[in-house]
């Protein structure tokens, strides 16, 4: 191997080759030339072959947006962090793996969480909040409706101002409220204040363990 001023790199020279470029049989060194060209190419491009690929930046659109990795942020000051996160809307934030936030100032901060609606928030794993100011704070919690709140594990609040604040509780209807575990309140302004209690109907209230109140204005105390 010798340095070639013409090629600007090292070249391979056959032991059979002479200075005039011919071997003892009078044939030109075509093979030597091919090897030289190959060596030059490897020297010039070898570093590129082993250079680590840069991970593509996230997709972002709008003033002040931020998206890294495989995330997407669309809207003024929208932020998407994690992996597979989507933030869509002004000042919207999706900050955990596979989280989705859609709407003005909506925020999804739990893994696989979904927050849709103005000022909505889903802050725990698999939590879902849909509706303006809806809040789902518990694991697997679901809040559906304007200002609905589901704050405990496996809790569900469906309806405007519905509140479910205990594990496994369900509140369905406008202004319904459930405060103890495994309880159910269904109907406008229905309330369930005891554990494992059931309230069904308008303005129904159940109080105490396993209390059941059914029908308009019913009140059950166990």
Predicted regions mapped to residue ranges:
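Cleavable N-terminal targeting peptides that direct proteins into the secretory/outer-membrane pathway or into
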Residues: 1-57
């Amino acid at each position: 191997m010798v340095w070639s001023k013409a090629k600007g790199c090292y070249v391979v020279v056959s032991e059979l080759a002479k200075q005039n470029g011919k071997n003892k049989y009078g044939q030109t060194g075509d093979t030597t030339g091919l090897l030289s060209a190959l060596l030059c190419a490897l020297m010039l491009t070898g570093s590129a072959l082993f250079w680590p690929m840069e991970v593509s930046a996230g997709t972002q659109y709008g003033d002040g947006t931020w998206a890294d990795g495989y995330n997407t942020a669309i809207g003024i000051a929208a932020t998407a962090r994690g992996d597979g996160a989507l933030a869509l809307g002004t000042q919207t934030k999706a900050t955990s793996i596979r989280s989705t936030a859609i709407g003005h100032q909506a925020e999804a901060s739990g893994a696989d969480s979904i927050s849709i609606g103005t000022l909505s928030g889903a802050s725990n794993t698999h939590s879902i909040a849909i509706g303006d100011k809806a809040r789902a704070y518990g694991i697997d919690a679901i809040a559906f409706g304007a200002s609905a709140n589901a704050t405990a594990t496996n809790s569900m609040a469906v309806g405007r101002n519905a509140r479910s604040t205990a594990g496994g509780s369900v509140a369905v209807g406008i202004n319904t409220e459930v405060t103890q575990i495994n309880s159910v309140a269904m109907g406008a302004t229905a309330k369930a204040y005891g554990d494992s209690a059931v309230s069904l109907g308008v303005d129904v209230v159940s109080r105490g363990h396993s209390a059941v109140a059914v029908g308009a204005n019913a009140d059950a105390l166990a």
